[in-house]
């Protein structure tokens, strides 16, 4: 069986190749030559129609597997070009893409192909949004100081209403949404899970000496992976704690930028130095060397 693995590669030089590698994985690289609107692409998501949406430093791109279509926010009040410097995205169940940019937040309706600017009713307006998570009617925004801002979305007034919640304005190391729409926040001393009704549960932070820069929570298997300083820590989630299972060391890998699940035991690891496939059952990994001249980091979309 063949698999398509699209790696969103952030390039400072352009180089393109499509090839087959071990285990029949086909790697496809999208660059300016295929119509990407900017060589710096930061984030990638998939909608329920199968389209891939790529956020770049010059607008939004839709990839259908063959062609790329570009979208640029030209709405009145959008501070160009900073509003089109897309830093992160998330998509809601109704097909709305929520976009965090270098100049605030806006949405894009994939059904009508229209942008809508949103105003946050606090001091976060017109500031860079580094991380964005949608949780039903709520939105989590991470600012440049790694602090979280929680809002309720008012679609009629195109506003974000601040929510008084314990997570607000607290510094974090990373934040993650699991497959049940629970949001996991990692700080220096604890891990907080926030459920869709905004109730919370706290866990003691695992004894990891370094900052945790990336996590994956798999609620179907109660497994948790934490990435810190080029190491991946394997845990099982029990009722009140994380139980340590194992650790994988990726030699000379300073930053792990993304983790995606493929099967119960197989995970794709995106790093500054290339792409790895990790099997947590036997704690082995394979390196997939991608033919890119200068590579900064990976975001992964595996199907």
For the regions a language model picked out, list residue spans one by one:
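Carboxylate-rich, polar loop motifs that coordinate divalent cations or form catalytic acidic clusters
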Residues: 1-303
């Amino acid at each position: 069986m063949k698999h398509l693995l699209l790696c969103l590669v952030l390039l400072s030089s352009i180089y393109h190749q499509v090839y087959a590698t071990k285990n029949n994985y086909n790697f496809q690289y999208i660059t300016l030559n295929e119509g990407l609107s900017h060589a710096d692409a930061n984030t990638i998501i998939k909608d329920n129609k199968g389209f891939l949406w790529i956020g770049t430093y010059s607008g939004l791109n839709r990839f259908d597997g063959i062609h790329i279509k570009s979208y640029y926010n030209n709405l009145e009040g959008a501070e160009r070009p900073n509003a089109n410097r897309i830093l992160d995205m998330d998509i809601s169940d109704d097909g709305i893409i929520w976009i965090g940019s270098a100049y605030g937040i806006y949405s894009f309706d994939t059904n009508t192909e229209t942008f809508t600017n949103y105003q946050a009713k606090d001091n976060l307006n017109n500031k860079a949004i580094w991380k964005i998570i949608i949780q039903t009617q709520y939105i989590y925004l991470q600012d440049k100081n790694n602090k979280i801002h929680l809002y309720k979305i008012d679609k009629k007034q195109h506003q974000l209403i601040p929510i008084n919640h314990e997570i607000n304005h607290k510094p974090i190391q990373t934040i993650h949404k699991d497959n049940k729409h629970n949001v996991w926040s990692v700080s220096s001393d604890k891990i907080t899970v926030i459920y869709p009704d905004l109730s919370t549960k706290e866990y003691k932070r695992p004894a990891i000496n370094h900052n945790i820069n990336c996590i994956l929570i798999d609620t179907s298997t109660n497994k948790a992976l934490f990435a810190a300083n080029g190491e991946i820590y394997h845990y099982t989630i029990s009722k009140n704690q994380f139980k340590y299972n194992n650790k994988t060391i990726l030699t000379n890998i300073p930053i792990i930028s993304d983790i995606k699940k493929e099967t119960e035991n197989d995970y794709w690891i995106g790093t500054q130095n290339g792409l790895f496939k990790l099997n947590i059952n036997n704690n082995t990994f394979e390196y997939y060397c991608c033919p890119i001249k200068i590579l900064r980091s990976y975001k992964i979309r595996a199907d």
